[in-house]
């Protein structure tokens, strides 16, 4: 029996101490910005009806063509630099506008959550509305409809404007 123990101990001594091996290497990762691919209609048509109502688009659909990330609308900027149309602040009373005034309050966003595209505290030819990331979100490969609301005064004269405002929509990937 002692002979077997001695044989086992001598075999272990010949092998030496067993130690795990370790080494290190650097892993390099390079990321490139993911291209955002969003489809937005190129024009919006409004009709200010004779009875004081407005016909606004019901099919202004924004499509997130990405298959990997949700996107959020974070800002809308509007400008009427070359036209007579102007944006009104929240405090303006459109019932007091002069007849044929091209001053409007312009709201847009998700149904029931429309935001005023505001020029600030006074009437202006430019304005913007902002959303927090997640307020107007579109899932990957899905679409979402944008709704509009316009407050305005009365018109005596029929008017047609081929272009009233330029609009820029800014999107971001959800965090």
Roles of regions detected by a PLM:
Residues 1-8:
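Bacterial N-terminal signal peptides that target proteins for export
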Residues 24-25, 34-36, 113-132:
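N-terminal secretion-targeting helices of virulence/extracellular proteins
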Residues 48-125:
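Surface-exposed interaction patch
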Residues 43, 75-81, 145-153:
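Generic short beta-strand segments
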Residues 9, 19-69, 154-175:
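Short, polar/proline-rich extracytoplasmic segments that appear immediately after membrane translocation
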């Amino acid at each position: 029996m002692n002979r077997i123990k001695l044989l086992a101990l001598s075999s272990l001594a010949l092998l030496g101490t067993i130690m795990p091996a370790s080494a290190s290497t650097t892993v390099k990762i390079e990321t490139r910005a993911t291209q955002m691919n969003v489809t937005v209609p190129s024009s919006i048509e409004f009709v200010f009806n004779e009875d004081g109502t407005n016909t606004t688009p019901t099919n202004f659909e924004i499509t997130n063509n990405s298959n990997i990330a949700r996107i959020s609308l974070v800002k809308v900027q509007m400008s009427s630099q070359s036209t007579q149309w102007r944006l009104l602040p929240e405090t303006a009373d459109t019932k007091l506008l002069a007849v044929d005034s091209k001053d409007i309050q312009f709201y847009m966003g998700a149904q029931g959550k429309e935001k005023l595209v505001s020029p600030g505290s006074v009437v202006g030819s430019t304005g913007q509305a902002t959303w927090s990331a997640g307020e107007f979100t579109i899932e990957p490969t899905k679409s979402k409809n944008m709704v509009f609301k316009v407050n305005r005064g009365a018109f005596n004269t029929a008017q047609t404007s081929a272009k009233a405002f330029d609009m820029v929509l800014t999107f971001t990937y959800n965090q």
